[in-house]
Every structure is written in structure tokens, then in C-alpha cells.
Amino acid sequence: MAAQGFLLTASFLLILFVLARPLGVGLARLINDIPLPGTASVERLLWRGLGISTQEMDWKQYLLAILTLNLLGLTVLFLMLLGQNLLPLNPQQLPGLSWHLALNTAISFVTNTNWQSYGGETTLSYFSQMAGLTVQNFLSAATGIAVIFALIRAFTRQNIDTLGNAWMDLVRITLWILLPLALLIALLFIQQGALQNLLPYQSFTSVEGVKQLLPMGPVASQEAIKMLGTNGGGFFNANSSHPFENPSALTNMVQMLAIFLIPAALCFAFGDASGDRRQGQMLLWAMSIIFVVCVAVVMSAEVQGNPHLLKFGTDSSLNMEGKESRFGVLVSSLFAVVTTAASCGAVIAMHDSFTALGGMVPMWLMQIGEVVFGGVGSGLYGMLLFVLLAVFIAGLMIGRTPEYLGKKIDVREMKMTALAILITPTLVLLGTALAMMTETGRSGMLNPGPHGFSEVLYAVSSAANNNGSAFAGLNANTPFWNCLLAFCMFVGRFGVIIPVMAIAGSLVGKKRQPASPGTLPTHGALFVGLLIGTVLLVGALTFIPALALGPVAEHLSLY
């Protein structure tokens, strides 16, 4: 079993890096404001036709454009969900959503979280899924990538105050990166058996004589960008464990690769754009080491199974509860780590049914900010925040002014870095405390004791870090939970983007200093270790008390 797990993880990473390297080259061209081959004339027509100014923006203008797009998208999607019953492509005549569920869902998809307090096939029309959620899957992914483009330019440019043009970046990312890749993946899903139609739900009688209603819909087109954009919200309530979304072992592997493809490619692009490929490779090494260790822990926990079941002489020691039998324990464990290391949240197994330690690892990966590959754009700018913190700590130890890629890191950058890193832990801990202190919060818990606390902690961690997965034993479709999680999602997304853009605005005007004998190398094994240690230190200091009350206490109670 250990050999199978090793081969599965190694083959996954090998294929990922082979696919991500060429994509990183294309992304680096866009970061450096170089049109992709054959696109320059099309872009000129687009800029004229859409009235887009090609003038570059400073960080405040860039941020304002990003916020404007997202707030407009939030308003449109909220109204669309409220009035769903008045819109076309609703063959099941589904009613509009309640105000709190519509608000939660709109914020969820605009922030790239895709938390779902509903079942897609019983709640949303085809129009809401296509024109509402799928559109936001593209725009939220493009937003994250645009922000990391601006931050990378801040490191590579000098003595100017502009970071590019947000509207041009958003159009290029959507047209030349997201749409072509999503189309290819969607066609593969359709060929493998995923649904793509606008038919009414189909009634049929099973071989047992039971009448059932099969949901239909444009699944493959949404599924592709759901994974590629690290969105994660399923067309169906069962998410990627549903055979209409994920019909085969091939599509399952493609889904996992799609989740990590752009985050890994952005690391390569960062190295190319900065002029030192070793910088991108350093980030990939740090991310990969944490990822592999987490996969090993989850696989080990799930293979050992539940001690309570083993006492009754179960046929297998594997923890198959909540697992899709088509994929098994090892693949389910790998998928769980992939989807929570990134800000995706799609699932092929119920994380609530994992062992205590097996479920703690996905929770912890979210809590450290999803910087292990992470979401499209957000994962890399989150990890770069930890890079700045690691450089600062190293500077304190050796008595030098910290610098990274030749840019001196001053008080302003460190204040913004600390603010961005502390936003999500504050939301998680205060949100969990609020839920546990109030009767309305506790009433949503369907399990007592440490596991019930873990469900609450997981939900708030997922929302604040824009993941969207859940321990399912929580009744979240209530005004309290919808509003609390909506607030966490909104602040967790834009409360980090704003200081990241402020850091970019501060760094871009600085001159790049040549390396000196006293400069800390940020591309070697020593710095990889320092970076991993910084991530672990922040995660440990912040969340160990909360984890001790939940999954750790539950694990100890099993023996």
C-alpha cells in the first residue's frame, strides 16, 4: 500500500510539472506585457471595440478596477439568484433563493470560495449555474491571477509607480489562458461521459422497480473551470464524487492536475519574469515538500482505519466510510490534500468521514492560508507573503536590512505583510468562538463533542481561506451561518488582496540593488527550510490550541 501511495503521488507531481512548465512560459510573457503569439492584432481590436485604455495604472487604480469588477459581479449574481424563478432555462421551475442564501452564494462564488449551503440540482436553475456561477468562476480566477501579476511586476520593475493595466490583464487571462484550457478539459469530460445538455430532468424506473428522477444540465462546461480556476463548487450536491461530474479514473486525475496546473505554472512564471528561475524553483520545492508530507499523513491515517470499527472485526482496516468506491482510499486521500492545499474545495470523498488525523490535515492546510500551491494567483501571493516574513526574520538574525530580489523590505511592507497574514487566522478564531458562544451557532451542529467542534472550525476555516469544502455534519443554511460565513469569505478575500496590492505599490518604485556578499540567498536549500519553518511556525502558534480541542482530542478519544 505504501508503494502504491508513493507511485500515485510521484506520478501526479511528475505529470503536473511537465504540463506546468510550458504554461509558465506563456504566463511570464503576459506578466512582462508581451502578447502571446498571434494575439496582438486581436487584442488591438478588442481594446478599441471595448473602449479599454491601454494606459498603465498605479496600485490604487489597479485595486479599484479589481474591486469594481467584483462588486459589480456580486450585485448582479445576488439579484439573479433572488429572481431565479423569473429567468429562463429553469425547466424544474425552481424558486428564487432566500436573501441570506443568495447573499452567501453570491459572495462565495465572487470570492473564489464556492462554499455551498445548498444542493445544486435541487436549488439552482440552468441559467443560474451557467450565466451566474460559471461566469464568476472565470472572473474570480482571473482576479487572483491579475493580483499576482501586479505583485510579480512590483519585484521585477524599478523606479516607476505603475503595475500594468488591470482591464488588459483580466481580458488576456480570461481569453488566452482560462477559456482555451477550460474548453479542452470540458471536451475531455464530455468524451468520458460527463453531462452537457439543457434537457429537463429525466424520469426512469430502476431494475428494482423504483421510479427516480435523474438531474441533467450543462455540467462539463462548469466542471472544467471549477477545477482549473480552483473554484470547487459542484453542479451537484455530491460534487466530484457524482459520476455525472467525474465519470472515470481519467477525469479524476485530470481534475486533480487541473487544480494545481495554474498555481504550479505561476511559480515557473515567477522565476522567468524575475530573471532568476531558481526563485520559482525554490517556491515549488517548498510547496512540494509540505504537500508530500501531508499526503503521506492522510494516506497513513486512512489506511489504518477507525479503531472502533476494527474492534468489531471489520473485513478491512481501510477507512472506506464516506469514500467513493470507484477511487478508493489512496486516491481519495490524495484528492483531499490537493483540494485543500489549493483553494478549490471540490471533493470525491466526505472529509467529515475521514479519521480524526486524516481530517485534521486538510483543515490545517486551509488554516495556513492555502499557500501549498494554493488558489490561482492567491496561493503564490500568499506564499510570497511568507517569503517576505522569512526574509525579515533572517534579517533580524544576521543584523541586515531584509531584501528580496534586490528590493529592500521596509517597515511599510512588513506592516502590510503582517496584516495580510493575520487577517484569516483572526477571522477563523473569532468566527469559531462566536459560533460556539451563541445558541444559533451551536444549533447548526449535528454532532456533539470534539467532532462537532471540528465541524464548526472546519467551516469557518474553509470560508475565511476561500476554500469551500466542508465537514458535512453542519446545518449551514440558516441566516446566522450564511451571514457569518459570507462575512468571513468577503473579508478573507479582499482583506488580503488590499494589503498585497499596497505591498506591490510600495515595492515597484524601489530600485533593485545588486547582490552583495552579505545578501541572503533566497534560492537554495537553506532558504527552502527557512520558508517551510516560517509557514509551520505561524500555523502552529496560531491554530494548535483550536486543533487540540477538535481533531486531536477526537483522535485521543479513539484509543
UniProtKB/Swiss-Prot annotation:
Keywords: Cell inner membrane, Cell membrane, Ion transport, Membrane, Potassium, Potassium transport, Transmembrane, Transmembrane helix, Transport. Coiled coil: none annotated. One of its GO terms (cellular component) is plasma membrane. It comes from the Bacteria. It is a multi-pass membrane protein. It holds the Pfam family KdpA. Part of the high-affinity ATP-driven potassium transport (or Kdp) system, which catalyzes the hydrolysis of ATP coupled with the electrogenic transport of potassium into the cytoplasm. This subunit binds the periplasmic potassium ions and delivers the ions to the membrane domain of KdpB through an intramembrane tunnel. NCBIfam families: kdpA. The system is composed of three essential subunits: KdpA, KdpB and KdpC. PANTHER family: POTASSIUM-TRANSPORTING ATPASE A CHAIN, POTASSIUM-TRANSPORTING ATPASE POTASSIUM-BINDING SUBUNIT. This is Potassium-transporting ATPase potassium-binding subunit.
